[in-house]
Amino acid sequence: NKVVKDATLSAFEIGIEGVLVLPGDLGFLNPNDIDQMIDLSEGLTRAVIARATADGGTNAILMPNGMLIDPSFGPGSFERHIHLANVANIPMSICKAKGFEFDLDRPEDLLAYRQSRSDFDEVLNWWTNKLKNI
């Protein structure tokens, strides 16, 4: 959480208009989900948050410059982030795009993801070979 806060503050200090904190375990995320989140920010005048369905965590948060919400990621963080935004008088919207709902936190999540993707083994082999050559 400290690293996310420090990186966000650094980005704001150099004039970045907004920061999207996005975990790397969102297997069903697609560009339309991100577009929806950006649209909900109404031209970066509102923060936007997306909930993790399984544990009530936060699977994405978009913070416009000047609207830092202290990162508090982990189980139950969705409600914590909303509370922190309210305390700081930061306007916030909730993004309910399907790609943000499911994350790969537990072994059973990976199993469900694998079963839902007919190309899972092919993609896994592609990444395995690609990473071997780095």
Please name every model-derived segment.
Residues 1-18:
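Short phosphate-binding loop-to-helix
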Residues 20-22:
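Short aromatic-hydrophobic micro-motifs that form the base-stacking/packing surface
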Residues 24-26:
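Short acidic donor-binding/metal-coordinating loop in glycosyltransferase active sites
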Residues 29-54:
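Conserved donor-nucleotide/metal-binding helix-loop-beta segment in metal-dependent transferases, i.e.
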Residues 49, 60-62:
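Conserved hydrophobic/aromatic beta-strand scaffold that supports enzyme active sites
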Residues 62-64, 103:
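Short, well-ordered beta-strand micro-motif
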Residues 64-85:
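Short, glycine-/small-residue-rich phosphate/pyrophosphate-handling segment
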Residues 83-134:
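Conserved alpha/beta core of the MobA/IspD/sugar-nucleotide pyrophosphorylase nucleotidyltransferase superfamily
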